[in-house]
Amino acid sequence: VEGERIKEMMIQRKNMKYRLVFQGIIVGLVTGVVIVLNRILINKFSLLFNNFYSWGNKDLLKAILVIGILATIGIIVGIMVKQEGMISGSGIPQVKGRVINKLKMNWSRILIYKFIGGFLALSAGLSVGREGPSVQIGASIGEGVGEKNYKNMPVKKEFLITAGASAGLSAAFNSPLSGIIFALEEIHRNFSPLVLLTVMPAAITADFVTKRFLGIEPALTVGAMDALPLSYYWILIILGILTGIMGVIFSKGIYLFQDLYSKFKNIPQEVKIMIPFVLTAIIGLTAPMLLGGGHELILHLALEEKSILFLTIIYIVKFLLLLICFGSGVPGGIFLPMLLLGAIIGAIVGSFSIDVFGINSSYIINFIALGMAGYFASVVKAPITGIVLIMEMTGSFNHLLSLSVVVIISYVTSELLRNEPIYEVLLERLLKRVGLTKEESDSKKTILEFCIEMGSIGEGKFISEVHWPKGCLLVSIKRGEKEIIPTGNVKLIGGDYIVVLVNVDRRCFIIEEINKLTLV
C-alpha cells in the first residue's frame, strides 16, 4: 500500500508542474494588481502628507495639530499591530518562517492589515521601505491561492508562497529578475526546478502588470553609467571593506533598538508605534527632505554632488530614524533604507576620490550604485540578489565586474566580522518571542526536493553511507535530465536533486537535518 502511495505521489508530482506554472501566473497577476494599487495610494497620500507638513510649519498651533494627527494615526497602526503581530516590521522574516513551516499565519488577515498599516506608515513618511511589506503581501496572496488548491499538500502551498514573495518584490521594484533571485536565494534557500517554475511566471506577470500601469522604468533607477576604468578598481577594495563594516554596524543597530523597545514591557504596543509617527511629524515640519524610506534621496544623490560632511550627517540621521521606526515594530521594511545608506557610503567614497585622487566626477553615480550593492551584500548576505538588483536599476550588464568586486569584498568583510544574515537573525528573534508553533501531528506524507551542493557533506557519499533522519524515505535522484533509482551503491554528486518522501509531522525537523547534509 505504501508503495502505491509513493507511486501515486510521484505521478502527481510530474503532472503538477503545469498547474504550478498556471497558478504562479495567477499569484503574479493578483499580487501585481494589489501592489500597483498600494504604490498609487502611497504616492497620492505622500503628496497630501507633504502638503500637510508644509501647512503645519506656518505657526505653532498648526504644528501641534499635525503632531496630534500623526500621533493618532500611530495609535491606530499600533492597535492593528497589537491585533495581528505578524504584520510588524518588514514581513520578510515572517515569510521565511512560514516557508519552513515554523510559523502559522492567517493570510487574509495579514493581507488586509499589512496593506493598510504599511500604507499609513509609508504615506506619513516614516523611514521604512515598501519592499518588505510588498513581499509579505505577495506571500499572503500566494498562500491564499495555495489554500484553495493545495490545502492538504503543504509543500505545494509553500511554492506559491515563495512565488508570491517573488512577485511582491518584482512589483515593488519593477525588477523581475531580482524578485526571482531574491525568492530563491533568500526566501526558499533552494534553487529547485519546481520552485523556479512557480516563481518565474509569478514575478514576470507581476512585473508586466506593474509596467502596464506605472511605466517600464525600474522603481528605483540611478540612470545610465559609464563603465568604471580598471585603473580605479583599487578604490573598490576600500568601498567593499567600508560597506562591509558599516553593514555589520547596521545589523547590530537594528537588534539593539529592538532590544531597547522590548525592555519597556509596561508601555503598550500602540504607544511604542506612536513614537516614530510623532518623530516623523516633527521631521516633516522641520526637515521634509529626510522623510520616507530614501527613494527621493537616492535620486537626489545621483543628480547632485554633495559635500562629505553633508553626506555623513544625512547618513547618521537617516540611520537613527530607521532604527527608531523599525525597532518599534511599525509595518515597514529595511530594504530601501538599507540601499539608501549604502548609496550614501558610496557617495562619500566617490566624493573623497574626486577631491583627493582627481577621478572624473561623472563616476559618482557608479560609486552610489556600487555602495548599494556592497551594503546589501553585507547585511542580507544575498550577494547574487545584490548584483542583479543593481544591474536592473542601471539597465546594463557592463558593470558586472565592478559590482562583483565590491559585493565579494563586502561579503567577505561581513563574514570575517561574523555577521549573520539579517533576515535569518530577525526570524530567530521572532521565533523566540512568539514561540514555535506545533506542527500538525498526523500520518500524512509529502514530497520534498533538495539540491546536493558542491562541497557539502553529502557530496561524494554513497546513499548507504548517509544517516537519513527518521521519518523520511529517499524515492528518487534527479541528475540532469535523468531520474535515478536510489539504491545503496549510488554515489551522490554535486548538482543532484534528491526527492524525499517525509511524514508531515516531522517535516520541519527533516528539512533542518537534510539541509545539514546538502548545503555548504
Give residue ranges: language-model regions.
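Alpha-helical transmembrane segments and immediately membrane-proximal extracytoplasmic
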Residues: 1-435, 454, 479-481, 495, ...
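A short, polar/charged loop/turn motif at coil->beta-strand junctions and beta-hairpin connectors
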Residues: 89, 116, 444, 468-471
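Short, solvent-exposed coil/turn segments
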Residues: 95, 443-445, 485
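Intrinsic-disorder/low-complexity, polar/charged segments enriched in Ser/Thr/Lys/Arg/Asp/Glu/Gln
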Residues: 297, 445-449, 497
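A structural signal for short secondary-structure junctions
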Residues: 368-369, 379-380, 442-444, 467-469, ...
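Cytosolic Rossmann-like ligand/nucleotide-binding regulatory domains
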Residues: 454-510
